């Protein structure tokens, strides 16, 4: 979704990853939107997917099947990142493996790392998130990371924990807020 949205906004986008035998819909949608798919590989297994259920408190409950999303290798990461460098943006989501390796290599190359910690899990604790330039997260992920429910407390705690980062906190039907550690823009 993020790759397609950025491509439709006119940004040159290269999507990297591994799809399974069920990946034609994704590949077709990416190509139709103008996303460069040269870094997408196919494996003879099912792709990863996520199911979102809503619980009795109207909160999302995410069920994740890793599939091909968990098949990144160091060699594949090296191959993809070899073509990118300083100032290039790298958008990551927590659905894939090798995040710690990807973040470390991208940071060494002075890329701007954008992290969407969805779906949130303990795997993120293995990553040096101080290397992240921008976090894209919702209120639930913000609470999981900081322990706070209030949007201002979430943003303040994130800025304290990651003082060099910027943040976009999505608020469902209430929109979103951007925070650079100094000013909050709704």
Q: Where do the language-model regions lie?
A:
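Conserved phosphate/ATP/ADP-binding segment of small-molecule kinases
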Residues: 108-112, 118-185
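Substrate-binding N-lobe of the ribokinase-like
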Residues: 1-49
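Short beta-strand scaffold segments in enzyme catalytic cores
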Residues: 49-53, 61, 175-179
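Short, well-ordered alpha-helical microsegments
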Residues: 23, 98-100, 121-125
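Short gly/ser/thr-rich secondary-structure transition/capping motifs
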Residues: 34, 70-75, 114-120, 148
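Glycosyltransferases and closely related glycan-assembly transferases
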Residues: 85, 100-113
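Conserved phosphate-binding/catalytic loop of the ribokinase/pfkB sugar-kinase fold
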Residues: 15, 40-42, 52-89
């Amino acid at each position: 979704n993020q790759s397609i949205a950025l491509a439709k906004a006119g940004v040159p986008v290269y999507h990297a990853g591994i799809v399974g035998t069920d990946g034609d819909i994704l590949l077709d949608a990416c190509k139709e939107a103008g996303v460069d798919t040269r870094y997408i590989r196919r494996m003879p297994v099912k792709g990863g997917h996520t199911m979102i259920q809503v619980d009795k408190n109207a909160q999302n409950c995410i069920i994740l099947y890793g599939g091909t999303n968990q098949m990144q290798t160091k060699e594949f990461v090296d191959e993809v990142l070899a073509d990118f460098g300083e100032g290039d943006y790298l958008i990551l989501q927590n659905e894939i493996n090798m995040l710690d390796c990807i973040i470390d290599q991208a940071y060494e190359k002075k890329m701007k790392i954008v992290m969407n910690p969805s779906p949130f899990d303990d795997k993120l604790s293995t990553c040096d998130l101080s290397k992240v330039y921008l976090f894209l997260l919702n209120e639930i992920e913000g609470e999981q990371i900081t322990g706070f429910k209030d949007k201002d407390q979430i943003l303040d705690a994130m800025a304290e924990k990651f003082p060099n980062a910027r943040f976009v906190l999505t608020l469902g039907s209430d929109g979103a807020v951007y925070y650079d550690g100094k000013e909050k823009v709704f």
